[in-house]
Amino acid sequence: MSQEFAHLSVLLNETVDGLNIQSDGIYIDGTFGRGGHSRHVLSHLGENGRLIAIDRDPQAIEAAKQFADDPRFQIVHGGFGQLAEYVEELGLTGKINGVLLDLGVSSPQLDDAERGFSFLRDGPLDMRMDNSQGQTAAQWIARAEIEDMAWVFKTYGEEKNSRHIARCIAADREKTPFLRTKDLADLIARITKNKERNKHPATRVFQAIRIYINSELEQIDQALEGALAVLAPQGRLSVISFHSLEDRMVKRFIRRHSQGESVPHGLPIMEAELNKSRKLKAVSKALKPSDAELELNPRARSSVLRVAERLDY
């Protein structure tokens, strides 16, 4: 792999340590990427351990060939939202000792201009995690209604100027279609008056389009529920988030399943009965990268790790 597209796994030790790995356990890396976390998990497994990796990016599947000779490893081409289905097909539901999810876009995807994720590198306006299927960002922008674009920018990017940006995109696309990342990024930079310090004006819009094109939040919701369904008692869930939308989802998911079912006030219920509805417990407070890691990998600055443990049924 070229140095340009090298990838540093974020919170590597903390994430894998959070899994509390058993040498003969069965683990899932739901976001294989370029294999950094998988490699670290495998280094903790004995010869009877097993790691099932998942990724929908064809380039990640190609990168997984580095582990082709390791009988403990297998790769599945697909989205992590379907992890429960893959585990069920393998007959391993309820037997998984740990699930790892590293959400968001990877450095190689950002750095490869041809993938169309970055507003800093000119390339085709694509943004698909799996570039073999689905509509591209350019195709969506070409036909989306102004209201729909504004909703996506505000909902998935928390962009305050969502409506203004959507109107400007709609007006400009009548003259020239948006086919390149630079075209879209330059337009947003040109029409944005109050620019945030140390943040490109197109950051939020590009994030929003990427999330929408790849149904990322739906995939995360399905992956979290799927992880809960496949984990064995005392199995661990380690999740790295990179922006507030992702982290809120993970935080609320863990909190909801840690508190158990809500009971109407005054209704007599035994503590043991209430405990049965509690499916998770938070293992630690949210973890952020150390100063040393941030110096080595500035892209880790917004990452947050949350770890939870599956309670007995």
Swiss-Prot record:
Its EC number is 2.1.1.199. The keyword Lipid biosynthesis does not apply. Pfam families: Methyltransf_5. S-adenosyl-L-methionine binds at residues 35-37, 55, 80, 102, 109. It is an enzyme of class 2 (transferase). Disulfide bonds: none annotated. Keywords: Cytoplasm, Methyltransferase, rRNA processing, S-adenosyl-L-methionine, Transferase. It comes from the Bacteria. One of its GO terms (cellular component) is cytoplasm. One of its GO terms (biological process) is rRNA base methylation. It is found in: Cytoplasm. GO terms for molecular function: rRNA (cytosine-N4-)-methyltransferase activity. It catalyses: cytidine(1402) in 16S rRNA + S-adenosyl-L-methionine = N(4)-methylcytidine(1402) in 16S rRNA + S-adenosyl-L-homocysteine + H(+). Coiled coil: none annotated. Specifically methylates the N4 position of cytidine in position 1402 (C1402) of 16S rRNA. Belongs to the methyltransferase superfamily. RsmH family. PANTHER family: 12S RRNA N4-METHYLCYTIDINE METHYLTRANSFERASE, S-ADENOSYL-METHYLTRANSFERASE MRAW. This is Ribosomal RNA small subunit methyltransferase H. It comes from Shewanella frigidimarina (strain NCIMB 400). The gene is rsmH.
